[in-house]
Regions:
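Conserved phosphate/anionic-ligand binding catalytic regions in large, soluble enzymes, centered on
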Residues: 73-93, 190-194
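Terminal, membrane-proximal amphipathic helices
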Residues: 1-75, 101-231
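Structural signature of FAD isoalloxazine-binding scaffolds in flavoprotein oxidoreductases
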Residues: 93-102
Length: 231
């Protein structure tokens, strides 16, 4: 059954022009932003200026991004724009962008360099969520946790490739599950339209909680309020 699902996901991904490299492009967009679509650094620093505390900024960002994922407005307003930039199906792109930006913002506020390729691999690993990451580590497909990868001695391009492929496969499974859920929910009045948003909200909450566990603060306790500007 697993092989059949994998084959089906590959066919769907091919038909939709989706490759694992799309998640690298999406992460770049989530970090840097584009026009009115703010990137992780900007969102994080804006909240840090407002709250004057890194952890308070993280709490606010977490709640904001969970709400964005659980609503339908972001996908409606930005899904087509994201599709034009990263060739990911609009319904997948909106949720993945929100999750990538939230995780990157958490890493930024915890003192990680977002231009470091090790950190970017770790962000993609965090986007797999706790269950996805644990399953791949147990199977030997991933050597360690996102926390260890972010601070590894050197960048491992083969690991980065494996992580992005795993994220692609998981995302295709996720989309398939949402489609089934929406199909079934259409049989129930007043429910069908919100099922996909509920799934995205739940998965985003799980990913954000996992990211907070993995990206342990690298700031001294006495560091105080500092705006981090990366080159």
């Amino acid at each position: 059954m697993s092989n059949a699902n994998d084959a089906n996901n590959k066919m769907v991904a091919t038909a939709e022009g989706l490759t694992s490299d799309a998640f690298h492009r999406l992460l770049e967009l989530a970090i840097t932003g584009r026009g009115k679509l703010l990137g992780a650094r900007t969102v994080a620093n804006n909240q840090l200026r407002h709250h004057h505390d890194h952890e308070a900024a993280i709490r606010w960002l977490s709640n904001q991004h969970i709400a964005l994922a659980g609503g339908q407005g972001f996908a409606t307003n930005w899904g087509g724009f994201l599709l034009s930039l990263v060739t990911i199906p609009a319904n997948m792109a909106a949720a993945a962008f929100i999750q990538a930006r939230a995780v990157a913002a958490i890493a930024h506020l915890r003192g990680y360099e977002l231009d470091d390729p090790r950190v970017r691999t770790a962000i993609l690993m965090a986007m797999l969520g706790p269950r996805g990451s644990a399953a791949l580590i147990a199977a030997g497909d991933l050597p360690s946790s996102a926390a260890a990868v972010a601070t590894a001695p050197a960048f491992d391009p083969r690991l980065d490739s494996r992580v992005s492929r795993a994220l692609l496969e998981q995302s295709m499974n996720h989309v398939g599950g949402k489609r089934l859920g929406v199909f079934l929910a259409k049989k129930i009045p007043l429910v069908g339209g919100g099922v996909g948003a509920v799934v995205d909200g739940w998965s985003t909450r799980s990913i954000i909680q996992y990211a907070q566990e993995q990206f342990i603060s690298r700031r001294p306790r006495s560091a105080g309020y500092v705006i981090i500007m990366e080159s």
